[in-house]
């Protein structure tokens, strides 16, 4: 696949950033990505206004100060989710990730020849699949990035961490994953 020059430059920057941040502990990296989230909140006005509008619609009883606080926390969380995707392999080893109901999930996966669908929303759930990669192949649904190079890097890093990417709205890929023999 041919990438645009801008996609290549962004890819090189992200790889460089990953290498530099690898020198820091996971705890510090999470704080750094929270900062990236807050930076995005302030720099991307269109997204910020959309986020605030959505929160106002969801919580009409909240005042502007509370709405802004919720919006900023949302951006911090998104920053941490991006960090988790980039460093998934490290996040899921050496006891860094605790999976609630892991025994139940393992039983469902081990005692079933059919596909097992685990729905976790944005509760940090895709790390669980990565932790249990020795049982079967796990997939997580992700929205494709506009930058194809970044999208390919994120997919590669997730796979290295034991998690396979399923593009959002790709029915054929979903059907193929569901019908795959474990």
What residues fall within each predicted segment?
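Residue-level signal for alpha-helix termini/capping positions
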Residues: 109-110, 134, 178-179
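Short Gly/charged-rich anion-binding patches and loops
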Residues: 16, 50, 128, 153, ...
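Short, composition-biased local secondary-structure segments
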Residues: 21-24, 124-130, 177-182
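Membrane-proximal helical "anchor" segments flanking the first transmembrane region
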Residues: 1-117, 123-125
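Conserved Motif II region of HX4D acyltransferases
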Residues: 55, 114-118, 174-182
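Catalytic core of membrane glycerolipid acyltransferases/transacylases, capturing the structured
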Residues: 114-169
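Short low-complexity, flexible loop/linker segments enriched in glycine and/or proline
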Residues: 80, 156-157, 182
């Amino acid at each position: 696949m041919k990438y645009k020059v801008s996609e290549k430059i962004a890819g090189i920057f992200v790889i460089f950033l990953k290498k530099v941040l690898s020198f820091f502990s996971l705890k510090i990296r999470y704080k750094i990505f929270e900062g990236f989230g807050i930076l995005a909140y302030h720099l991307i006005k269109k997204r910020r206004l959309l986020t605030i509008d959505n929160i106002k619609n969801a919580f009409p009883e909240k005042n502007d100060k509370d709405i802004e606080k919720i919006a900023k926390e949302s951006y911090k969380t998104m920053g941490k989710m991006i960090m988790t995707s980039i460093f998934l392999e490290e996040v899921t080893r050496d006891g860094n990730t605790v999976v609630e109901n892991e025994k139940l999930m393992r039983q469902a996966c081990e005692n079933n020849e059919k596909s097992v669908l685990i729905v976790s929303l944005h509760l940090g759930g895709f790390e669980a699949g990565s932790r249990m990669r020795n049982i079967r192949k796990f997939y997580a649904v992700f929205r494709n990035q506009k930058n194809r190079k970044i999208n390919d890097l994120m997919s590669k890093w997730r796979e290295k961490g034991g998690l396979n990417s399923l593009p959002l709205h790709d029915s054929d890929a979903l059907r193929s994953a569901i019908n795959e023999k474990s």
